[in-house]
């Protein structure tokens, strides 16, 4: 009998998933337990940053956990199989170290460089295509979650994807909240028509929405602060060098696990560089480029949410939330970021 991923998860994840959807849709298990989806359980949502002491997090929340959680949120609010599956599949093309590959592809700002592979991966999966045929669902109804506004929409609106990674990062990865607060936030959400007459998630209560903005504004800075930008670019540059030296193919990044690539790095000439980063406690910054030192100087995707409270953006009705959003958006990314011991020549 085939293993069931949902039976293997720990109690913290079970409790979280149960908040998102108390009545788990059993039909979803067949899709979760396909080879292509199960591969995602070995990829961290932290884009590899979890492997460095620069970050405090020890909770491994996988790309698969995120996909399941997004699917549960969509199912909770829509009870629509096609939309739910589009959410489950939205990161099926996620490679090792997640968005680090976008940094390899020089896609710092949109971080969408891998999404073109989604259709191809689903189409080439005999398991998934058989299930879709069984359920009378067309590939083009589930391979693009941008089609469904509850699944995904444009910043600064609230969608299932944006909501999920905010909740799980706050709860598990960066410990900015606890399970009771997550439950309070989630249970305050409803679906309304936004200013464009399109369905969007909204809060019922201004106070809860303000708490959510406080959390997401802090997270948004974490996603692009010095240690994060440095870590993602360093890992991307190491992988790029491994690729140039034929030690790792681009295909490997979609087939291997995070730990497999780490093992390859440890057996390469980049071992010392990786271990300096792995054991580092704090990055250094400079307004000018440090001489002969490997440094990172780039912007990154700005993730922020200005949610609706009933039918109005919170920034229009709450000065505290407006200031939190403005502070988040004004975060300075002009500095050069570096670590002692890693030279420019090492990665050029």
Residue ranges, per PLM feature:
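Histidine-centered, transition-metal-coordinating active-site segments
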Residues: 2-82, 96, 100-348
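Short alpha-helical catalytic segment bearing the HExxH-like zincin motif
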Residues: 83-91
């Amino acid at each position: 009998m085939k293993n069931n991923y949902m039976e293997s998860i720990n109690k913290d994840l079970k409790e979280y998933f149960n908040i998102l959807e108390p009545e788990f849709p059993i039909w979803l298990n067949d899709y979760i337990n396909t080879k292509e989806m199960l591969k995602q359980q070995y990829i961290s949502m932290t884009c590899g940053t979890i492997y460095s002491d620069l970050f405090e997090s020890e909770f491994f929340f996988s790309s698969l956990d995120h996909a399941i959680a997004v699917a549960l949120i969509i199912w909770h609010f829509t009870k629509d199989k096609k939309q739910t599956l589009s959410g489950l599949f939205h990161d099926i093309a996620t490679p090792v170290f997640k968005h680090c590959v976008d940094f390899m592809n020089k896609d710092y700002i949109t971080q969408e460089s891998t999404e073109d592979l989604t259709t191809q991966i689903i189409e080439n999966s005999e398991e998934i295509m058989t299930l879709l045929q069984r359920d009378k669902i067309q590939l083009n109804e589930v391979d693009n979650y941008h089609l469904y506004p509850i699944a995904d929409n444009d910043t600064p609106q609230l969608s299932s994807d944006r909501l999920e990674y905010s909740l799980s990062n706050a709860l598990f990865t960066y410990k900015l909240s606890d399970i009771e607060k997550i439950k309070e936030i989630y249970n305050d959400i409803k679906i309304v028509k936004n200013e464009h007459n399109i369905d969007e998630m909204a809060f019922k209560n201004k106070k809860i929405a303000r708490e959510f903005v406080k959390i997401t504004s802090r997270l948004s800075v974490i996603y692009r602060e010095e240690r994060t930008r440095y870590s993602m670019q360093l890992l991307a540059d190491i992988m790029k060098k491994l690729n140039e030296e034929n030690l790792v193919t681009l295909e490997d990044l979609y087939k291997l696990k995070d730990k497999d690539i780490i093992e390859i790095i440890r057996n390469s000439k980049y071992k010392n560089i990786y271990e300096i980063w792995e054991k580092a406690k704090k990055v250094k910054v400079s307004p000018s480029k440090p001489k002969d030192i490997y440094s990172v100087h780039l912007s990154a995707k700005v993730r922020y949410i200005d949610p609706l409270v009933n039918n109005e953006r919170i920034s229009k009705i709450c000065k505290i939330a407006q200031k939190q959003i403005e502070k988040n958006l004004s975060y300075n990314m002009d500095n050069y970021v570096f670590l002692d011991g890693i030279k420019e020549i090492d990665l050029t």
